[in-house]
Each structure stands twice: as C-alpha cells, then as structure tokens.
C-alpha cells in the first residue's frame, strides 16, 4: 500500500479550530514535524482540508 509523508510547514496559530483539530488528528505538532500515513481517501480528505499548512510527499 502506498504511503505519504505529511510535514507541517505553517503554524496553526490564528487558524480555525477545525483546522487545528485536523492537524492534531494527523499526528502533527510543531512546525517541521512529519508523519508517514497510509494513502487512502480518509487521509487525503484530511490533507485537503489543511493543504495550505502542510507539504505532502509520496513514500515508496
């Protein structure tokens, strides 16, 4: 199964509470923190909600 590496590149300060909760649900905390997640519809949906805060790379 494919995986994606999600890295938080912008702060969640002054963001909507739903965006803050999504960042926390993905397992991201501080800026430049990264997490490897499965590439599925649920993960992609969460990433879409905070696309302006994160960078996404495919992991082989």
Swiss-Prot record:
A GO molecular-function annotation: structural constituent of ribosome
CDD domains for this protein: Ribosomal_L30 (cd01658)
Keyword annotations of the record: Ribonucleoprotein, Ribosomal protein
Keyword Chaperone: no
Pfam families the record matches: Ribosomal_L30 (PF00327)
InterPro entries on file: Ribo_uL30_ferredoxin-like_sf, Ribosomal_uL30_bac-type, Ribosomal_uL30_ferredoxin-like
GO cellular component: cytosolic large ribosomal subunit
Entry keyword annotation includes ATP-binding: no
GO biological process: translation
SUPFAM superfamilies: Ribosomal protein L30p/L7e (SSF55129)
Alphabetized NCBIfam families for the sequence: rpmD_bact (TIGR01308)
Quaternary structure note: Part of the 50S ribosomal subunit.
Family: Belongs to the universal ribosomal protein uL30 family.
Protein name: Large ribosomal subunit protein uL30
Organism annotation: Limosilactobacillus reuteri (strain DSM 20016) (Lactobacillus reuteri)
